[in-house]
């Protein structure tokens, strides 16, 4: 089992940019056609889309989710056990910021517009 305290063993993004006792902040940047590695979210997290148009999320169970993204969109997710990856299938570079919340379980929901 991967230790959630060690992000090197389960990288959520392409770069870990900040970490303290409360949060861990990742950046993802994927060129068109590029794929981020397989990982599992062991902490609740919030994503903020910076740039991009469409990505797909292949899941370990064989399903694939197509996700149209809008810059500025904010989504909150609960930790999960389904291993997945992320591939940029759009025509623009995909940039995303992920904030993992340590020690808190918020449940999945979309943030209200303007939040």
Predicted features, each with a name:
Residues 36-38, 56-57, 83-90:
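Short beta-strand His + acidic residue motifs that chelate non-heme Fe in jelly-roll/DSBH
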Residues 9-37, 44-47, 96-101:
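A short glycine-rich, His/Asp/Glu-containing loop-to-beta-strand
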Residues 1-12, 104-115:
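Basic/polar N-terminal segments that are highly enriched at the extreme N-terminus
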Residues 42-61:
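Glycine- and acidic-residue-biased ligand/ion/polar-headgroup-sensing regions
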Residues 79-104:
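Ligand-binding loop in jelly-roll beta-barrel domains
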Residues 61-80:
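Short acidic-glycine-tyrosine-enriched beta hairpin
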